[in-house]
Amino acid sequence: MKRVLLAEDDPDTATAIKTALEERLPITVDHVTNGALVLDQILATHPDLVILDVSMPGLNGIDVFDLLRGSPSLVDVPVLFLTAMPDLARQASARFGISDVMAKPFDCDALAQRVDDMLARVAKVA
């Protein structure tokens, strides 16, 4: 079973995302509430995909992404950004090579499709 790590500080949004993805796809979603916990969780669970909220307390999603890309063992982890600031995320995507960006609010079916597509791309590369 595929594993996804969700970094989202809003508990209602996190619950909605986790429920929507696990109901629609054969995946397990692990959740952390802030950017500082992401790296430890990645090392502990080895997710197939990381979903990052851009605006989190402590380390924001862009900071976390920068740390991921700076670590040789984590550089290839695919990342999906969720943001209420799509222009900022698109700029970061172009600058840092972010795998994908999705604007909030989003449709749960569209999110599940995007996650499924990204996981399929990862499977083809592996």
Where do the PLM segments sit?
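C-terminal output helix
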Residues: 106-117
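Acidic catalytic/metal-coordinating carboxylates
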Residues: 34, 60-66
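Acidic, metal-coordinating helix/loop segments flanking the phosphotransfer/catalytic sites
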Residues: 31-49
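Conserved acidic carboxylate
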Residues: 8
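Alpha4 helix (beta4-alpha4-beta5 surface) of REC/receiver domains from two-component response regulators
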Residues: 18, 63, 85-102, 113
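Active-site residues of response regulator receiver
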Residues: 53, 83
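Receiver (REC) domain active-site loop signature in two-component systems and cognate sites
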Residues: 56
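Two-component/phosphorelay signaling modules centered on CheY-like receiver
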Residues: 11-30
